């Protein structure tokens, strides 16, 4: 279906024809733990990766398979792996690339949970991270060490929607034989496809825009199929015979899909952050309307940004669409159709004013999720990024007066009226 446009792909990939077992037009929920093999040789071929297909519910499921194929197609990748959450997708990606004694270079203005994973949790397993100003290309390159295994970015930083120069950083990573990993949760494949700009691996918290309705946890890892694991010489777990899977070289057995096949066969097998069939089904429902929802998110966001930029109680609006934003040129390059419906602004009066404003909102829900059809709000310094030190918060541009908004799809006049009454 490669000739079809995004809006068609989001509806059909993975189930081009009706379900063969039931003739169902909708993707069925295959609520099963196990699959019957035709005979002993068939079972052996499945376990030996000689025959693609279901082995056990912790590894694959037919509902999950449709979801994976669909997101891979939307991102322009060769294969994907769905997980129980976005955090699991990010963790598996790093664990597949780095082992004890290895190093990651990461953009410092990322989601607080990802920052904490890299800064604290993974250090317990011997993986260290250098956080960099992604706008300083020299700093990015100079931070690469002999034991560096990946460069990690977000298409739109959390919470301030800052934008890295993906093309330039991809060139740096590839110069050093490293894959570029990009979290495209906030960008979505409808607005930007990082693989087209040099990304090798794309991750999502599918809980956000892909699901879109605040009902379902899930994550997904997309393999571009473009990184040469053998030529790099740094990833023996993928390119060389793997003793944990009877000597299989995943680069040989799975070809372009080696990366996600390794995660499925080893990390998912051993640690089990498996997405449920029901969650995969719900995320498919969200995927079918992704383009329609994103268009409304973007349209509403433009008007909210304009409203806030002209409000006397607002000190600063952190949105790259504004001409005076330092990433405005990158925004125009990478997001020609708009974007960044999750962003922050600084209210005058600091924390007290921020709390008062948030507590007066009526349509906006105060919660930790983002990218819902409903408008959402939170105070990052005391919640999502509260694990960061005062220095780290300042370094990421998060102040006591910073408020994060996630603009939903409600009527724009109702959204603006709610914001205005909260200021008053």
Model-derived segments and their meaning:
Residues 156, 185-187, 322, 348, ...:
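Active-site beta-loop-alpha junctions enriched in small/polar residues
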Residues 1-30, 221:
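Short conserved active-site loop signatures built around small residues
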Residues 39-88, 113-120:
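Conserved N-terminal alpha-helix of the aminotransferase class I/II PLP-enzyme fold
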Residues 222, 344-346, 406-408:
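Short hydrophobic/aromatic beta-strand micro-patches
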Residues 2, 14, 18, 80-311:
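Conserved PLP-enzyme active-site core in the AAT-like
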Residues 76, 147, 313-316, 363, ...:
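Glycine-centered tight turns that cap/initiate beta-strands
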Residues 271-274, 278-280, 285, 289, ...:
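Conserved small-domain helix->loop->beta segment predominantly found in fold-type I
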Residues 119, 128, 146, 293, ...:
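PLP-dependent enzyme catalytic core of the Aspartate aminotransferase-like
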């Amino acid at each position: 279906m490669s000739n079809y446009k995004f809006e068609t792909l989001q509806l059909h990939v993975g189930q081009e024809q009706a379900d063969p077992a039931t003739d169902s037009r909708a993707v069925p929920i295959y609520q099963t733990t196990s699959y019957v093999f035709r005979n002993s040789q068939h079972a052996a071929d499945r376990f030996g990766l000689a025959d693609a297909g279901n082995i056990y519910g912790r590894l694959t499921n037919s509902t999950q398979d449709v979801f994976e194929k669909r997101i891979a197609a939307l991102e322009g990748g060769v294969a994907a792996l769905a997980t129980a959450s976005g955090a699991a997708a990010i963790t598996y990606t790093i664990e597949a690339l780095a082992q004890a004694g290895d190093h990651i270079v990461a953009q410092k203005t990322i989601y607080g949970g990802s920052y904490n994973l890299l800064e604290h949790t993974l250090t317990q397993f011997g993986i260290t991270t250098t956080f960099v100003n992604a706008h300083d290309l020299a700093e990015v390159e100079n931070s690469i060490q002999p034991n560096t295994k990946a460069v990690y970015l977000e298409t739109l930083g959390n919470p301030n929607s800052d934008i890295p120069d993906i093309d330039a950083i991809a060139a740096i990573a590839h110069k050093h034989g490293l894959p570029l990993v990009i979290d495209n949760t906030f960008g979505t494949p409808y607005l930007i496809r990082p693989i087209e700009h040099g990304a090798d691996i794309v991750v999502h918290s599918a809980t956000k825009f892909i699901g879109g309705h605040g009902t379902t946890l899930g994550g997904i890892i997309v393999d571009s199929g473009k990184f040469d694991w053998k030529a790099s010489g740094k990833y023996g777990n993928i390119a060389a015979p793997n003793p944990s899977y009877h000597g299989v070289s995943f680069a040989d057995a799975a070809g372009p899909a080696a990366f996600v096949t390794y995660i499925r066969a080893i990390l998912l097998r051993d640690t089990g952050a498996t997405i449920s069939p029901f969650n995969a089904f719900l995320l498919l429902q969200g995927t079918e309307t992704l383009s329609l929802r994103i268009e409304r998110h973007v349209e509403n966001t433009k008007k909210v940004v304009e409203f806030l930029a002209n409000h006397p109680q607002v000190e600063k609006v952190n949105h790259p669409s504004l001409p005076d934003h330092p990433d405005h040129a990158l925004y125009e390059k990478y997001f020609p159709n708009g974007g960044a419906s999750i962003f922050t602004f600084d209210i005058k009066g600091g924390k007290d004013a921020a709390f008062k404003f948030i507590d007066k909102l009526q349509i906006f829900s105060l919660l930790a999720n983002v990218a819902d059809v409903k408008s959402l709000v939170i105070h990052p310094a005391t919640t999502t990024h509260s694990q960061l030190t005062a220095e780290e918060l300042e370094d990421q541009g998060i102040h006591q007066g910073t408020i994060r908004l996630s603009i939903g799809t409600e009527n724009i006049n109702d959204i603006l009226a709610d914001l205005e009454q909260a200021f008053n």
